[in-house]
């Protein structure tokens, strides 16, 4: 958390997952056998992910209820790193939100269902804020906050292209920010005061290599 009282952590329970073996041919003087947990397609044994909140003042740990989909995955959202922090050896890891609330994503294994969720300290479970549903694989990008957390900028492929959408903190869509037959790649900076977003995009010019990025 920004005030360092709490920290959230995801834990993957792989005990039921079967092992996979590979040969490390670069080992010296002879190749070695490497073993790790890996779920093959069609296998029922899958990692189970848990979310914990730790209180460093009260010295307590709490597991937060996150279950929704079979073989789901969860991922915490983090505050964007400042430019001066990019070259630091020990980079800060601060959750996206305020001292008592943070955001995370919850995804089904086939990535057809993605929930942007929030958690407020004191609750027992997370709360879905934005729900994405598609019959194809979806990608995601980091969430961004505006107006002291009262607004959210979400990257979504819902119309077949990657674009930005503005929501309030209750999950109500206010408006779409970008539109067109091109792809928003990454948000670089958000000017909260001027309400301006600096981002990179691909495919802006149909006669140009689509891998060329524009700012």
Please describe what each predicted stretch is.
Residues 1-3, 84-98, 142-148, 189-192:
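Structural signature of eukaryotic scaffold interfaces centered on beta-propeller domains
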Residues 1-79, 213:
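Predominantly five- to eight-bladed beta-propeller fold
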Residues 49-57, 117-124, 166-170, 213-215:
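Beta-propeller blade signature
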Residues 62, 79-83, 127-133, 173-178:
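A short beta-strand motif characteristic of beta-propeller blades
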Residues 68-71, 132-138, 180-185:
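Short coil/turn segments at the loop-to-beta-strand junctions that recur within blades
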Residues 162-163, 173:
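Glycine-enriched catalytic-core subsegment of oxygenase/oxidase enzymes
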């Amino acid at each position: 958390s920004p005030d360092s009282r709490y920290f959230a952590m995801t834990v993957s329970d792989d005990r039921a997952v079967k092992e996979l073996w590979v040969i490390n041919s670069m080992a010296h003087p002879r190749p070695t056998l490497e073993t790790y947990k890996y779920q093959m397609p069609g296998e029922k044994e899958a990692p189970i992910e848990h979310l914990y909140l730790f209180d460093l003042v009260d010295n307590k740990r709490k597991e937060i209820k996150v279950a929704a989909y079979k073989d789901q995955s969860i991922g915490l959202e983090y505050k964007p790193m400042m430019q001066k922090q990019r070259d630091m050896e020990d980079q800060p890891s601060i959750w996206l939100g305020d001292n008592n609330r943070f955001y995370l994503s919850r995804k089904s294994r086939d990535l057809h269902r993605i929930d942007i969720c929030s958690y407020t300290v004191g609750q027992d479970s997370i709360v879905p804020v934005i729900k994405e549903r598609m019959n194809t694989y979806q990608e995601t990008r980091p969430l961004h906050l505006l107006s002291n957390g009262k607004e959210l900028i979400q990257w979504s492929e819902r119309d077949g292209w990657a674009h930005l959408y503005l929501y309030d903190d209750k999950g109500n869509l206010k408006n779409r920010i970008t539109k067109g037959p091109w792809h928003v790649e990454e948000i670089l900076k958000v000017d909260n005061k001027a309400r301006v977003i600096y981002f990179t995009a691909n495919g802006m010019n149909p006669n140009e290599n689509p891998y060329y990025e524009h700012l």
